[in-house]
Amino acid sequence: MAQWEMLQNLDSPFLDQLHQVYSQSFLPMDFRQHLASWIEDQNWREAALESDDAKANMLYFSILDQLNQWDHYSSDPKSLLLQHNLRKFSRDIQPFPNGPSQLAEMIFNLLLEEQRILIQAQRAQEVQPPPAPEAVVESQQLEIENRIQGLHVDIEFLVRSIRQLKDEQDVFSFRYTVFSLKKTSSSDPHQSQQAHVVQATANKVDRMRKEVLDISKGLVGRLTTLVDLLLPKLDEWKVQQQKSCIGAPPPVKSAAEQLEQWLTAGAKFLFHLRQLLKQLKEMSCLRYQGDMFAKGVDLRNAQVMELLQRLLQRSFVVETQPCMPQTLHRPLILKTGNKFTVRTRLLVRLQEGSESLKAEVSVDRNSDLPGFRKFNILTSNQKTLTPEKGQRQGLIWDFGFLTLVEQRAVGAGKGNNKGPLAVTEELHVISFVVEYTYQGLKMKLQTDTLPVVIISNMNQLSFAWASILWFNMLSPNPKNQQFFCQAPKAPWSLLGPVLSWQFSSYVARGLDSEQLGMLRTKLFGKSCKMEDALLSWVDFCKRESPPGKIPFWTWLDKILELVHDHLKDLWKDGRIMGFVSRNQERRLLKKMLSGTFLLRFSETSEGGITCSWVEHQDDHKVEIYSVQPYTKEVLQSLPLTEIIRHYQVLAEENIPENPLRFLYPRIPRDEAFGCYYQEKVNLEEQEEYLKHKLIVISNRQVDELQQPLELKQDSESLEVNAELLLAHDQELPLMMQTGLVLGTELKVDPILSTAPQVLLEPAPQVLLEPAPQVLLEPAPQVLLEPAPQVLLEPAPQVLLEPAPQVLLEPAPQVQLEPAPQVLLELAPQVLLEPAPQVLLELAPQVQLEPAHLLQQPSESDLPEDLQQISVEDLKKLSNPSTEYITTNENPMLAGESSGDETSIPYHSHFDADGLLGWTLDTF
């Protein structure tokens, strides 16, 4: 930053010192501010302290000449005061007896005072917090803009100086030629006078040549300063781009355009100065004894060419790193045979109007690493940029359809990797070369991409991305292709933000300090208190990480995939706590209200999320329950929000209840997740098929409590196995009323097998074939014996609703809903016995308990609707024809009209398919 710019940013006490210094000086502050860049670039020490006044005289006349150039400011009313002050100062310094030396000493002393004030301010700021990064960036941008504006003035001043030198040199050539032709005798007074004039002209030409060289030297110095300011800005942009490739926020979109504007301005100055130096080179043909003008011009030209080479070479960049369209969130990973895109750009937007620029791409251009695979560009490896396109969009080469193919090794199929590195640890570099031509200058420009990992199978994508993360996080050299031959360890101070970037870039929300703390403990353990603890590459992605047997990166990447595919909205809105250890989970929940729950990622499964809640017992014990983790296979069938909404646990009385009441800390469940619930189904809508939905019910096993593997570390925690059940949209409230027990041991199984035991079709015919024999024993209990026997405890209502709805109650009467056709095929024998149990044995081989045959009920014992059915009607019902069945209308019983058809459910003692735990509803 320029010294004057730094002075302007000082606090008030130091600014007061600066005003006091200039109030006591003859040099006005307006002059100091307006020529700040030029003043700071001159060597005032040499002009003030050395005995030779040549340097002071040159600077003195340069100041006078610049002060005389401010006449164009008179057109601007705002510059009237500035113009007046500068003119006054120009008049005041001319009468000085030793004007050049006094002026040089004055400016030199003022610069020393300014440096003293700056040192005091810097010492005072050492104990204060640094300024905001935004303020620093704005200050740097302002300095660059000011320097560019100052260079415009300096270039114009050099142009005028060269023009004046050329005119004076022409005058000297003319006078010298005339003097040589008329030379007669040295004693001629007229000739002596002419010789004196010629000598004076020669001295003036020599002085002006030195001034021009000094002006060009100062201009080269200021251009060097500008380039030194711009290239770090360009490096910052490249670093931001590199970090954005691994998830960090990308650079501002306008950053590249701003850099292009600055770099183009700097290149224009250099090319203009190069043309001016060519003119000076032509003027150097006039030589005299002791003339150093030609050597000075050659030296300036060499400096300009060096600056141009630096600027152009660094300005050729890869604007968009290589990326496949199907994995935009993970650039720098390429698959053989798949297309990928990459874009290069020359940030110096200068192109000849008739010259096309051609870019050529290659893989591993200058490297021959042993054991590394070799690749070729399958498609065209060249891209041509026409002048018309360059003027319209900039000097951009967009490669959109590149494809890599592996080279075949001699004596083998494809080139196999025999090196020390795995395929996902091989780093390859894609290079671009452009033959740049402008104003007669020809230069070969080259740029490289960040190292890429080339895979042959998408299964390698996860480990390849781990390599990209590790390299771009730690490597100081972007071209180090053998980085993984001895991969360095990563400090947590770098690894933590990178892990957070994976979530912020992919699922729109990063990790907070508590979540990062859990990951840090998982990686380094509780005993490690160092902030910069080091983690090896093997521990990050290869070695198993406790408590599960999964490498850390595999576990984390599966969670990323799960959140992106199924939980993105919940994660973005902060509903998922996510990274919580078991101990931390207990500390959070044990002081909360009963029913408070949180969502965390399982540490023992790949891509699993579980729900844990707290319950306070009557004996003041605190129990923490956790559901078996849900993976993507489960969430593909049922969203997590619907699981939370309809989750049920069977209590001791077999009454289903939802234990999830408050999302941690105290947000009501429906308030937290209501906006994510699926739309309610219109119950009055007639459909061709019976609708169904999946809900989750768990059975709280009080007597036979077994802790699963994940809960063995915590004796006070219980993990309840969950099962997906198939039910009608109307079923859930009815289930909660009936208290139906679906099973004693339920498992999470996303594949709902229909089995041959229950048939549910939209037809009006219901076939119920439980076993060779069915024993109906009216009793307060219903026992289902699939494989491990399922016991249904007394409940006021047991509902089995096929298509036409059949209701049997444990009363002496059996009511059958009016329906045109109901086929109930029980078995070859139907035994009715007043016993306390109803046993449905659905297995292929069923052994029936002893039972007594009962008398068939008399007609008076039957319901009124059944008494009206004759034997012929029953035969028709047992063999219905297609004309009795329509899309939205059921066959009618005797005495029933079409308007009597309702959707009122009737309760039945029949139950089926206890093995699956299905509950059937019908309209």
UniProtKB/Swiss-Prot annotation:
<dbReference type="InterPro" id="IPR012345">
    <property type="entry name" value="STAT_TF_DNA-bd_N"/>
</dbReference>
<dbReference type="InterPro" id="IPR022756">
    <property type="entry name" value="STAT2_C"/>
</dbReference>
<keyword id="KW-0805">Transcription regulation</keyword>
<dbReference type="GO" id="GO:0001932">
    <property type="term" value="P:regulation of protein phosphorylation"/>
</dbReference>
<feature type="modified residue" description="Phosphotyrosine; by JAK">
    <location>
        <position position="689"/>
    </location>
</feature>
<feature type="region of interest" description="Mediates interaction with USP18">
    <location>
        <begin position="137"/>
        <end position="571"/>
    </location>
</feature>
<dbReference type="InterPro" id="IPR013801">
    <property type="entry name" value="STAT_TF_DNA-bd"/>
</dbReference>
<dbReference type="InterPro" id="IPR048988">
    <property type="entry name" value="STAT_linker"/>
</dbReference>
<feature type="domain" description="SH2">
    <location>
        <begin position="571"/>
        <end position="666"/>
    </location>
</feature>
<keyword id="KW-0597">Phosphoprotein</keyword>
<dbReference type="Pfam" id="PF21354">
    <property type="entry name" value="STAT_linker"/>
</dbReference>
<dbReference type="Pfam" id="PF02865">
    <property type="entry name" value="STAT_int"/>
</dbReference>
<dbReference type="InterPro" id="IPR035854">
    <property type="entry name" value="STAT2_SH2"/>
</dbReference>
<dbReference type="InterPro" id="IPR036860">
    <property type="entry name" value="SH2_dom_sf"/>
</dbReference>
<comment type="similarity">
    <text>Belongs to the transcription factor STAT family.</text>
</comment>
<dbReference type="GO" id="GO:0090140">
    <property type="term" value="P:regulation of mitochondrial fission"/>
</dbReference>
<dbReference type="GO" id="GO:0005634">
    <property type="term" value="C:nucleus"/>
</dbReference>
<dbReference type="GO" id="GO:0003700">
    <property type="term" value="F:DNA-binding transcription factor activity"/>
</dbReference>
<keyword id="KW-0238">DNA-binding</keyword>
<dbReference type="GO" id="GO:0060339">
    <property type="term" value="P:negative regulation of type I interferon-mediated signaling pathway"/>
</dbReference>
<dbReference type="InterPro" id="IPR000980">
    <property type="entry name" value="SH2"/>
</dbReference>
<dbReference type="InterPro" id="IPR001217">
    <property type="entry name" value="STAT"/>
</dbReference>
<keyword id="KW-0832">Ubl conjugation</keyword>
<dbReference type="GO" id="GO:0005737">
    <property type="term" value="C:cytoplasm"/>
</dbReference>
<feature type="modified residue" description="Phosphoserine">
    <location>
        <position position="284"/>
    </location>
</feature>
<dbReference type="Pfam" id="PF01017">
    <property type="entry name" value="STAT_alpha"/>
</dbReference>
<dbReference type="Pfam" id="PF12188">
    <property type="entry name" value="STAT2_C"/>
</dbReference>
<dbReference type="GO" id="GO:0060337">
    <property type="term" value="P:type I interferon-mediated signaling pathway"/>
</dbReference>
<keyword id="KW-0804">Transcription</keyword>
<comment type="function">
    <text>Signal transducer and activator of transcription that mediates signaling by type I interferons (IFN-alpha and IFN-beta). Following type I IFN binding to cell surface receptors, Jak kinases (TYK2 and JAK1) are activated, leading to tyrosine phosphorylation of STAT1 and STAT2. The phosphorylated STATs dimerize, associate with IRF9/ISGF3G to form a complex termed ISGF3 transcription factor, that enters the nucleus. ISGF3 binds to the IFN stimulated response element (ISRE) to activate the transcription of interferon stimulated genes, which drive the cell in an antiviral state.</text>
</comment>
<dbReference type="InterPro" id="IPR015988">
    <property type="entry name" value="STAT_TF_coiled-coil"/>
</dbReference>
<dbReference type="InterPro" id="IPR013800">
    <property type="entry name" value="STAT_TF_alpha"/>
</dbReference>
<protein>
    <recommendedName>
        <fullName>Signal transducer and activator of transcription 2</fullName>
    </recommendedName>
</protein>
<dbReference type="Pfam" id="PF00017">
    <property type="entry name" value="SH2"/>
</dbReference>
<keyword id="KW-0963">Cytoplasm</keyword>
<dbReference type="GO" id="GO:0003677">
    <property type="term" value="F:DNA binding"/>
</dbReference>
<dbReference type="InterPro" id="IPR013799">
    <property type="entry name" value="STAT_TF_prot_interaction"/>
</dbReference>
<keyword id="KW-0539">Nucleus</keyword>
<dbReference type="GO" id="GO:0051607">
    <property type="term" value="P:defense response to virus"/>
</dbReference>
<dbReference type="Pfam" id="PF02864">
    <property type="entry name" value="STAT_bind"/>
</dbReference>
<keyword id="KW-0727">SH2 domain</keyword>
<comment type="subunit">
    <text>Heterodimer with STAT1 upon IFN-alpha/beta induced phosphorylation. The heterodimer STAT1:STAT2 forms the interferon-stimulated gene factor 3 complex (ISGF3) with IRF9; interacts with IRF9 in the cytoplasm. Interacts with CRSP2 and CRSP6. Can form a homodimer upon IFN-alpha induced phosphorylation. Interacts with IFNAR1 and IFNAR2; the interaction is direct. Interacts with ARL2BP. Interacts with E3 ubiquitin ligase DCST1; the interaction results in STAT2 ubiquitin-mediated proteasomal degradation. Interacts with USP18; the interaction is direct and allows the recruitment of USP18 to IFNAR2.</text>
</comment>
